[in-house]
Amino acid sequence: ITSDEIQQILIKSASDLISLENPNYQYVAARLLLFSLRKSLHHRLWEHPHLKEHVNNCIKLGVYDDEFLNWYDEEEINTMNDMIKHDRDYIFSYAGLRQVIDKYLVQDRSSGQVFETPQFMYLMIAATLFRNYDKEKRLSYVKKYYNAISQHNINIPTPVMAGVRTPLRQFSSCVLVDSDDTLPSIFSSDMAIGRYVAQRAGIGINAGRIRGINSRIRGGEVQHTGVIPFLKKFEATVKCCTQNGVRGGSATVHFPIWHQEIEDIIVLKNNKGTEDNRVRKLDYSIQLSELFYKRFIENKEITLFSPHDVPGLYEAFGTPEFDELYEKYERATSVKKKKIGAQELFLSILKERAETGRIYIMNIDHCNTHSSFKDVVRMSNLCQEITLPTDPLQHIDGAGEIALCILSAINLGALKNKEELENLCDLSVRGLEELIDLQKYPVKAAEISTKARRSLGIGYIGLAHFLAKNKLKYESPDAWKLVDEYTEAFQYYLLKASNQLAVEKGQCEYFNKTKYSDAILPIDTYKKDVDSLVKRKLSYDWSTLRKNIKEQGLRHSTLSAQMPSESSSVVSNETNGIEPPRDY
């Protein structure tokens, strides 16, 4: 038996002993796993190669970006080598280190050979992000960012952790693709989806414009096949790539509740039916507005339409003009329609949601009321935390707008005090800002809009840990007050950081397409019913910030999002996102 086989037996034995009663075995197993990694990589446990030697080796192997040595001189590389704290590898729990090794460290996935340790990964990410900063200050930012991510104060998502430092430059977690009701648009959207799925992105698809089954085409020459055949095409594209072995492709498709085929759409994931009338490997988001909630409460009917038969209705969805136009089409005798009880339809949606767990609800009017954009938001992303404007493609290299969002999160569970948020928010914004120009864009419509809007999504992980640390429960008024205080600081410091970057680099090109350009801030648009739950005054100087934003602008169109962080939070040994803990 080899020493490596003995080590693997020890790792498994220690991991099998992890329990609620004996949680510290997670660190025993992690250390054994770490020593196995170091031995296979460096052939020793305690000594590590110099950063330059490590980088040269990885460049020769083709797993690191070969431009790195052009960015930094030898003196800077020596300084960065001294920054690395390899003992921080001991911070990992077993699950966290296992996740890092399996998903994030650069490696040959066919042979299983890993080429870096976690601390080299973190340092290379920080060095790559701040490569374009002035030479006098960039190493200071590299050190601060390295310290923040290696100590798990800032959480970075899968595309960033797996991709920054490598030749594959695609770091957006969220890609939103909007399809029109034409074959060129549907096929162009499908190609765009394929290109981004292959590069680690999660996909949001808007198919709400596609006309319903048996609709007339070319004056009745052809009857439409409906949405399901096109969803099958999207499904095949999403699932044909395993995203470089990092994660499988996934997508959420969006439809308005008034779509003609909604009754067939909401059952697409269940286990009844046949392969011909089910599309189970996609998730679905059903879009509602206040009108439909009123119909539900009053036990009235909802009228279903094919979007093609009601010109302008889809474009009005999510705006104040929708209700009047919708009721006008309900009265029109010449328009093909179908009526269904609102309560019957709602209960069907809730039943499928309860049984499959992957049918989401998107309140489209609420999203537009509270968004930072003047443009209408028509869809969300894979995990439903992002609301960005989109415009359908008509050709893969043509006009349109594919929305991209790069994510990160502040680890609330690791915070010692609220004042730490200022530095962490600034570092998060600056780091993600650099990725927008570093990454490559496989579709032109994504590059144009992303560089013009510069959308970021920075959120929380570890909220449950944070509350537990403060001896508070989710349902406690004291918890609401504390979260309100921290979230005010969080929003304030994100906006302050973006405003400072606007001073340094200029406001984003589409700043005037945001509500921020009219000095409308999150403190103006949040749902005021919150004030009945948390009675306190604002703590920060919002009036000065408002003035600065009005005069100097922001570098980003939007800054915050509460992503689920299901896999990346495991690395930090934290509860995911803002979610409460689930049963053991």
Describe the predicted segments one by one.
Residues I1-Y584:
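Extended catalytic cores of very large enzyme megasubunits
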